[in-house]
From Swiss-Prot:
UniProt-annotated location(s): Cytoplasm
Annotated protein name in UniProt: Alanine--tRNA ligase
EC nos: 6.1.1.7
Positions that bind Zn(2+): 552, 556, 654, 658
Gene (name only): alaS
Length: 863
């Protein structure tokens, strides 16, 4: 039975028994910040089990996509090295919400296994919770399971709970016996971790509610939650012991093997790549993009682990994205969302792999150089941190390499360096004393949506975080009023500036910040005395406020335009709204093209010209989401939210101040676009009078440039193109001459090539090092055609080594073994692939002897 037939048979079986077939939920759990990813079939029904949500059915069945990588459930480091660990898997499940219970759940499971997929009953073993007499009676007396294949197990394996408190209950598990030829013992025995007895189905009987004291109280409506891994049952039905040998994986392994030119399909690296393309593709389908934190960083870790294993297989160019097509052939029919977004997934994977490959070789070279001068058997935490911070190596990728070389990782040292980095970041972001949280500053009523001037009472004065009763002329401090039109810095919008006035008194407000429920006005008392209890007039600077609201409303239009033109995967990652500019950080996998930026800018200006009214409305959070208002991912909102609408074009949850109409923005101009982190881009823009001034200055620069080149402004581009073409031709000529010199130098080196047992070889010292050494090796391999090359470069007290074996000889000689042989003689070690490897050493005095030993090594190791 194919995996597709198995999935369909399972869902059809339960559909025929009154179950609603529920499509797989996304891998990102909805409204559940406690979970990184959907990691079990019951996750989409969690609120139903807790009684907080009602569905239009009491029976359900699904084939739920799941990911276990990162967080509590993390199988990443084992994937590729075991038969059943995966980052991505499908959980077949059936569920009852207060409808049927143990008897029907057990009966359904036995019927499906023995009648539908026709597993021999004598191969099935059953376990129940040790105190669950009801389940035991059903299995033994009603189903008729042989007592010899029945076990009672303790709470560790056979009692399930959602958390420390809440719904919980006993489990019953069904195991398949692969037979005595496979090592391992039955469930509950000392040998149960072997591969002979494999759990295929877990039935959870949710019948209790555990309270804070640990008491188990019976639930009024017991429920059923079952889970069966599609991959495991497919392996059983297809007669294999390794999930990677099923039809879910073999097309992916074959495709990766074809790309790598590898005939041995059992290589762990092929399994890693086949597993990881499933997880990465569906995470991207469900809206996760590679980034430096949270879910995006887990995705990045998985992609980079796959790329490194591809490198191990000898793949020298981006390849991972090419596996999306065979994945679509395997899973696209069952999950059409993959087919719909296939091109997008390929683009994300290609960009991420390309970015990582730019640092991969440098990182591996750093690691080899370190290992060449260290024989402690441990990769120091400082090196692990440098690989992570400079070269983008996730820690588990370094651990992967360490395992292959029988090394340990200094996790404690790495964590210490990470803690230092976090502390530096915290120190850099701390405010001065006046901005620190004032615990008892009271509460300010904000009136700045309606007015820029208001009368209020001073309810607090602070200097350096200390409460004072009065401020004298010339003193700086913070003033808290009971009501104020000053907007306090929040949501990316800077605080208002202005002044606080009374008879003979002027306090210049330079900034406004939140202090709990109060607004703190930071500034300097220029004249008069100010005391707690004084009545004052608070006046916001109209010019800076109007400039700020223009930029804030423009930010909303920019966000909408980015999603319209680049795609709905765009999410806000940060913003700054100030009087003089706006800055917007957003998720996107590549730098937008110039054409895209022009379209985005034009789209925003089109909405400005339309002169939409800007309207604010308060409503329930659920209602706001239903009407399409965008909420910032990861932001916490109250039950009632404020929605800002700019016509029909943009609706966002926002507490900031805005223009009255989009036309008030005047003009929108993008002045810069950069990358701030992997998968995060930044746009800086200006509006209004500042945008007009920028355009006028740009026109002036063009006119001056045209004068310098002695052409009219209309012919400026043509003139620059002519000059550029002339420069390119000259650069090509220079490069041609360089290549000619390099070829002559290479031929000179190859004059020293020898031959042993029919294999040509060259082992010699050259000048320089770093990437130039690798380039020289590649050039010599091309000129040699067939053979073995070892190059050494001595720099001070260090030796750098590279070894290359042409493709026609890699089945007989391995560059990694050769470079280790040479490196050992100069006090070092290294590693790499069959066709290329590199190493470092710390004893240059023996480099000539080490190179001289290459001939004998080739002779001894030819197979």
């Amino acid at each position: 039975m194919t995996s597709a037939q198995l999935r369909a048979a399972f869902l059809d079986f339960f559909r025929e028994r009154g179950h609603e077939v529920v499509p797989s939920s996304p891998l990102v759990p909805a409204n559940d910040p406690t979970l990184l990813f959907t990691n079990a079939g019951m996750v989409p029904f969690k609120e139903v089990f807790l009684g907080r949500e009602q569905r239009g059915y009491q029976r359900a069945t699904s084939s739920q996509r799941c990911v276990r990588a990162g967080g509590k459930h993390n199988d990443l480091e084992n994937v590729g090295y075991t038969a059943r660990h995966h980052t991505f898997f499908e959980m077949l499940g059936n569920f009852s919400f207060g409808d049927y219970f143990k008897r029907d759940a057990i009966r359904y499971a036995w019927s499906f296994l023995t009648e539908v997929v026709e597993l021999p009953p004598e191969r099935l073993w059953v376990t129940v919770y040790e105190d669950d007499d009801e389940a035991a009676q059903i299995w033994l007396e009603e189903i008729g399971v042989d007592p010899a294949r029945f076990r009672r197990i303790g709470a560790h394996d056979n009692f399930w709970s959602m958390g420390d408190t809440g719904p919980c209950g006993p489990c019953s598990e069904v195991f398949y016996d692969h037979g005595p030829e496979v090592p391992g013992g039955p469930p509950g025995s000392d040998e149960e971790d072997g591969d002979r007895y494999i759990e295929v189905w877990n039935l959870v009987f949710m019948q209790y509610d555990r309270d804070a004291e640990g008491n188990l109280n019976p639930l009024p409506s017991p429920s059923i939650d079952t889970g069966m891994g599609l991959e495991r049952l497919a392996a059983v039905l297809q007669g294999v012991h390794d999930n990677f040998e099923t039809d879910l994986f073999t097309p992916l392994i074959d495709a990766a093997g074809e790309i790598a030119g590898v005939s041995d399909r059992r290589k762990p690296s092929l399994k890693v790549v086949a597993d990881h393309i499933r997880a990465c593709s569906f995470l991207i389908v469900d809206g996760v993009l590679p980034s430096t934190e949270g879910r995006g960083y887990v995705l990045r870790r998985i992609i980079r682990r796959a790329v490194r294993h591809g490198y191990q297989l000898g793949i020298d160019e981006p390849f991972f994205y090419r596996l999306v097509d065979p994945l679509d052939a395997v899973m696209g029919e069952a999950f059409p969302e993959l087919r719909d977004r296939r091109e997008f997934v390929e683009k994300i994977l290609f960009q991420e792999e390309k970015r990582f490959r730019e640092t991969l070789e440098d990182g591996l070279a750093l690691l080899d150089e370190y290992l060449g001068g260290n024989d402690s058997g441990v990769i120091d935490g400082e090196v692990v941190f440098k690989l992570y911070d400079t070269h983008g190596f996730p820690v588990d990728l370094t651990a992967d390499i360490a395992r292959e070389r029988n090394l340990e990782v200094d996790y404690q040292g790495f964590e210490a360096r990470m803690a230092e980095q976090r502390e530096r970041a915290r120190a850099a972001s701390r405010f001065g004393g006046a901005r620190e949280e004032v615990v008892d500053a009271g509460e300010s009523r904000f009136t700045g949506y309606e007015t820029l001037e208001d009368v209020g009472s001073v309810i607090g004065l602070y200097q350096d975080g200390r409460s004072v009763q009065r401020l004298q002329p010339g003193e700086e401090g913070m003033v808290v009023l009971d009501r104020t039109p000053f907007y306090a810095e929040s949501g990316g919008q800077v605080g208002d500036r202005g002044e606080i006035l009374a008879n003979g008194l002027r306090f210049r407000v330079a900034d406004t910040v939140k202090q709990g429920e109060a607004h703190g006005h930071l500034g300097r008392l220029e004249s008069g005395e100010l005391g707690v209890g004084d009545q004052v007039t608070a006046r916001v600077d109209r010019g800076t406020r109007e400039a700020t609201v223009r930029n804030h409303s423009a930010t909303h239009l920019l966000h909408a335009a980015l999603r319209e033109i680049l795609g709905d995967h765009v999410q806000q990652k940060g913003s700054l709204v100030a009087p003089d500019r706006l800055r917007f950080d957003f998720s996107h996998y590549e730098a937008p093209s110039r054409e895209d930026l022009e379209r985005i800018e034009a789209r925003v200006n089109q909405e400005i010209l339309t002169n939409h009214p800007v309207e604010a409305a308060h409503m329930a959070y659920e209602e706001a989401v239903q009407v399409g208002a965008m909420a910032l991912f990861g932001e916490k909102y109250g039950d009632t939210v404020r929605v800002i609408s700019l016509g029909d074009y943009s609706q966002e949850l926002c507490g900031g101040t805005h223009a009255a109409r989009t036309g008030d923005i005047g003009l929108f101009k993008i002045i810069d676009e950069t990358g701030v982190a992997g998968g995060v881009r930044r746009i800086e823009a200006i509006t209004g009078e500042r945008a007009i001034g920028w355009v006028q200055e740009a026109e002036g620069r063009l006119n001056r440039l045209a004068d310098l080149l002695r052409v009219g402004p209309d012919n400026l581009v043509m003139k620059v193109e002519q000059l550029s073409e002339r420069t390119r031709e000259q650069e090509k000529e220079i490069e041609r001459l360089k290549q000619k010199l390099a070829t002559q130098a290479g031929r000179s080196l190859l004059d020293d090539a020898g031959e042993v047992a029919g294999v040509r070889f060259l082992a010699t010292c050259v000048e320089g090092g770093g990437k130039g050494l690798r380039d020289t090796l590649d050039q010599l391999k091309n000129q040699l055609g067939s053979g073995v090359i070892v190059l050494a470069a001595v720099q001070g007290e260090k030796v750098q080594l590279v070894a290359g074996v042409t493709k026609d000889l890699t089945d007989r000689l391995a560059a990694g073994d050769l470079v280790n042989h040479v490196a050992a003689q100069v006090g070092g070690r290294g590693g790499g692939r069959a066709d290329f490897a590199q190493a470092g050493g710390k004893d240059p005095s023996h480099v000539n002897d080490a190179l001289a030993s290459v001939e004998a090594w080739i002779k001894d190791n030819l197979t």
